[in-house]
Amino acid sequence: MCYTIPALVEDVNKGIATISYFGERKQAFCEFVHLNPGDYVYAQGGYVVEKILPAQAQKTLKAWKDVFFELRKIDAVSAALDSSDVSSDRLLQKILERARKGITLSKEEALYILGLKDEHNQLLVRRTANYLRQQYHNNSCCVHGILEISNICVRNCAYCGISSSSCVKRYRMSLDEIMAAAGEAINKFGFKSLVLQSGEECGYSIDELANIVASLKNKFPVLIFISFGEIGVKGLRQMYDAGSRGLLLRFETSNPALYEKLHLGSKLDSRIDHLKAAYEMGYLIVTGGLIGLPGASNDDLVNDIILTSSLHAEMFSFGPFLPHPDTLLANFPAPSEQDVLGVLSLARLMCAEKAKILITTAYETLSSSARENGLMSGGNSIMVNVTPLKYRSLYNIYPHRAHENQTVAQQVRQALSMLKSFGRGPTDLGS
């Protein structure tokens, strides 16, 4: 969003630009923009999305320069470990020391961490996760906008409030409405990355969805993620050719039997094959599972993290199960906040270097302090809902969603204030 800074193009070679943020070099694909050394750009997800005038870039960089390094100092102090960050639990201390050295945790070690009950030890795990986040990713925090274009869905998932059996009022935004909402997010609030989300077989044909993506790419400088469920390999290719470069598709559980029980008529293998095909096609992958899903064990949760990593996820998306009154799982409890933080921090410990970990809206719905606690437990990504208010409450996947009645402006102000207070800075998602 507006939490972005321009980069200087230092070199362009075979469609890949070397770009510099205050002297720190990264690389980004430049397939959408023709570049020369000396140009200034905005990049997201490892893609250059916009070339900007030097005067505009230099003005922004001047405003950011001192702030950029001050934020890093704030974050480094808050993420540092000290002499109090030790445990009398010798096995835990050994596991955390191994994690700090970059040694991959075994499944048994991961299960031990998830089974911790002592509050001090739980806090120590979270602080270690935050330390590793800072060591590998510095203070970068990515912010995406999410635009929910339709709540129509043919799936009948046992936990979802917009499943085909739900009595929720259905909507499908028109192309003009989508363009207007995206235009406000991009032009007024400076978003550089948008997730387009809907139910599966959401009232648009694949051709119509591809036209939406192409229309947005032709008009706006933005990285587009799609989240339309399983649309098939042909559909993925059509969306990619239209300009989408990211896919948000969660598998929810790595347990095949539990998956089939909760997703009637569907198989986990189909989901995984879809994600693998998207990665091979060039998509940035965002995936993960539900925490506290009825019937899931700690063993399943560890397998969820392992599977997410094996799918080459650019971003891990793990959120709590939240019961919806109109679903088969209405009477099951949500997990505790500690359960959620335990999984987020374990994901950081297990995948410290590559994981970008999202603080989901579901977690924000579970806890008003989700962003703060999640970002201090290894998380480094948030989302802002840019869906028009008249539709937002109808995307009722679980009750009383966070930010359901907030304007985009209100959400942006809150997000910026919170990120700056934690010393988090803007980032390009690519490596």
Identify the role of each PLM range.
Residues 39-40:
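Structural motif
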Residues 146-147, 194-206, 257-259, 320-332, ...:
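Glycine-rich, proline-tolerant flexible connector loops at the mouths of alpha/beta enzymes
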Residues 102, 129, 157, 249, ...:
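Conserved, mostly hydrophobic/aromatic
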Residues 163-179, 185-207, 212-275, 284-291, ...:
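Core AdoMet radical
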